[in-house]
A protein has these predicted regions:
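Structural marker of alpha-solenoid helical repeat scaffolds
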Residues: 11, 44-45
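Short, ordered, surface-exposed loop/turn motifs in non-cytosolic proteins
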Residues: 237, 367-383, 454-472
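Canonical positions in the second alpha-helix
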Residues: 7-8, 41-42
Length: 487
């Protein structure tokens, strides 16, 4: 594709859409400097293009993602085949996944679109940090079409999974004749699936034959179901949505995760860890390849800034579908990177969200002397407090802040007797190892005398305080022998 786009560019000007595709291909092939040059060319003619701006705002982003290679680790697992293996999730002591290895229900049926075997659900035993002994699941779940990405509600003993929108043998096709994806669920008892052939299978109430609904992911408390859909109201190709559990097998109206998470591209494979972190895959958030793995924290006010998990979890290939075990650090993901057995392979991983260190000093603006004991906080480029930042105050006014990657930071500081001040940092252009935060002393003056209310005699040793407009104490002192005070 890269050669074809290069030839097209040599023949004449490309459209903006073709230029973006060309830049994305360059990025996917690991040619990051050339990709940045292409994005810059697009920006010259379309300066308000949101997707292009996101890449240009962090021109060295790709190199920094690749450098952070020691925090995460990747390992192979012995359950892959020569076909596609993907769609991982965890059910108690089992790893569930989808495979096109052709050992499923009905034999090796082929999907006409790509002449590949239909996907079926398999299980494998979790053993430490790996999985072994893959085994195809029963026909209570698998059928002769696609059966894919699943999620397990351990509290309700219920499995939600993606399949072609087929129920009781009826193909629920769109008006165009296309068979879309839907979510279905079945309950499990005593570690076994329901013995009813299809009686235990229930369609998700928000399935619709006119659009795809899939990639379900239940929150650890079972109160929210996340899923992927191309339904109306989204921002791009496929968006991440969620529904609240209303009880009695009812779900609230689907809500879109919003512009923090969803883009003009495709977001897929949501997964929520025990510490309220949403992991997902995207081909439009700035990343190393086609699809990268990302995360953001879920807060009462909404999702935090989206962070790329970096290399080696992400490469120039398609890396996606990250899930974690109960320890929130050991997990699995899917990639089509080189060196695998099939078109898609399952990999084990150890995950630590990427962080970077900001170092600096707090000083008096006039005297340039170090200020000890200042209180700092840090916000991202959207003005949100970065609650997961680790701020350490050292001697001589020095500080260290370990913080996730972001496009911009604002560090603010204060101390009694000083005005609050902040410094903005662009990690793409500003040094992160010598940040200066300058604080100004309050510019005030006040003097007076404290006297006895009746005798009018000066009072010695009376405590006097100076407060700001918010009743915050700025300074206190005691009166001199003549009853006078001076601030």
């Amino acid at each position: 594709a890269e050669a074809a786009y290069k030839q097209m560019a040599n023949m004449g000007p490309l459209s903006t859409a073709d230029m973006i595709d060309y830049a994305d291909v360059l990025r996917g092939n690991g040619h990051y400097n050339e990709a940045i040059a292409q994005y810059q060319a697009i920006s010259a003619s379309d300066p308000e293009n949101v997707r292009v701006k996101s890449y240009l705002q962090q021109a060295d982003f790709f190199m920094r993602l690749k450098r952070d290679s020691t925090r995460n680790s990747v390992r192979t697992v012995p359950i892959n085949s020569a076909e596609a293996d993907l769609g991982v999730t965890v059910m108690d002591d089992l790893l569930l996944f989808s495979s096109a290895r052709g050992e499923g229900i009905g034999g090796k049926n082929e999907y006409q679109w790509d002449e590949q075997p239909f996907l079926n659900l398999y299980t494998a035993l979790l053993k430490g940090q790996t999985a072994v002994e893959p085994y195809v699941m029963r026909k209570d779940v698998n059928h002769r079409y696609h059966d894919g990405t699943a999620t397990y509600d351990s509290l309700a003993k219920r499995l939600y999974f993606t399949r072609d929108n087929v129920f009781y043998g009826t193909l629920n096709k769109a008006k165009s004749g296309e068979l879309k994806l839907g979510i279905f669920y079945t309950d499990i008892t005593a570690g076994e699936f329901s013995q009813k052939e299809w009686g235990g299978l229930v369609p998700f109430e928000h399935n619709d034959p006119e659009f795809n609904t899939g990639h379900p992911s239940i929150s650890p408390d079972g109160k929210r179901l996340y899923f992927v859909s191309d339904r109306p109201g989204g921002r791009g190709g496929t968006d991440i949505w969620y529904c609240e559990n209303l009880g009695n097998n009812k779900w609230g109206v689907p809500s879109n995760m919003g512009e923090k998470v969803n883009t003009s591209g495709n977001e897929m494979y949501p997964f929520v860890s025990g510490d309220s972190v949403l992991y997902f895959s995207s081909n439009a958030h700035p990343g190393l390849g086609g699809y990268d793995n990302f995360y953001c924290r879920l807060t009462p006010s909404g999702p935090s800034a989206v962070i790329n998990l970096g290399y080696p979890l992400n490469t120039r290939f398609d890396d996606r579908n990250l899930i974690l075990l109960k320890d929130d650090s050991t997990g699995f993901f899917v990639s089509d990177r080189t060196g695998g057995q099939g078109s898609d392979d399952i990999y084990g991983c150890t995950v630590h969200p990427p962080m970077q260190m900001i170092r600096g000093r707090v000083i008096d603006k006039k005297s340039r002397e170090a200020i000890n004991g200042a209180v700092l906080d840090i916000k991202d480029g959207n003005g949100r407090f970065m609650d997961d930042a680790k701020i350490t105050m050292l001697e001589d006014g020095k500080f260290e802040i370990e913080v996730p990657f972001a496009n911009a930071y604002a560090i603010s500081g204060t101390k009694n007797g000083y005005l609050q001040n902040s410094v903005s940092i662009d990690p793409n252009t500003d040094p992160l190892d010598d940040v200066l935060l300058e604080l100004d002393k309050y510019d005030y003056g006040a003097e007076g005398i404290v006297m006895h209310g009746e005798t009018m005699a000066p009072l010695t040793g009376v405590k006097v305080g100076l407060y700001d407009a918010n009743d915050k104490l700025i300074q206190d002192l005691t009166t001199a022998a003549d009853g006078k005070y001076t601030f």
